[in-house]
Amino acid sequence: MEEALEARPRRWIDSLTSLRIEHYVPKLRKNRIREQRIHNEVIVDAYGPEEQALGWYYYLENKIQFPFSARCMAAKVVSPLRKGETVDVRSLAPEDSCAHDMLVLIRWHGRNVAVPLSQLTATDADESTVEAIGDWHYWLAQGSCF
């Protein structure tokens, strides 16, 4: 068992021991416009992880027009979706559910299910929605988290 763990990348082991949620999104090149928008509209007055989460929640709530269609970009352990599945996104999950990740509610097999926004890309949405989701993906890709 120890040999198997030693073969794993160190970052993976560190994330397990600290119980930190890791987002495996490819790192994007710096985007000055996006950086300024995120700073000025999302985290400008945030003095800690809880306030950053609230900043993101209200930013996304104001910018995203629900409902919209989205496709799953990658499967995640915490979500029932498989890569390539298309879903209708109905709303943000309740605020208290988004303290560690931004979750959205979808209708899936006759049930309302919360899934990470980070695993979805909008396929039929307005410009504001696409931009807001892109900002969230960008922030995660830069290695940021709450």
Question: Where in the sequence are the language-model features?
Answer:
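A short macromolecule-binding patch
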Residues: R111-L120
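Short coil-to-beta-strand transition motifs
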Residues: V77-D88
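Residue-level recognition of beta-strand microenvironments
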Residues: R90-L92
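Short strand-coil-strand connectors
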Residues: M73-A75, R107-R111
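Short aromatic-glycine-enriched beta-strand elements
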Residues: D96-L105
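Mixed-charge, Lys/Arg-rich low-complexity intrinsically disordered regions
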Residues: W12, L16-V78
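Long, low-complexity intrinsically disordered regions
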Residues: R29-R34, T129-F146
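Lipid interaction determinants
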Residues: L5, T121-A122, S128-E131
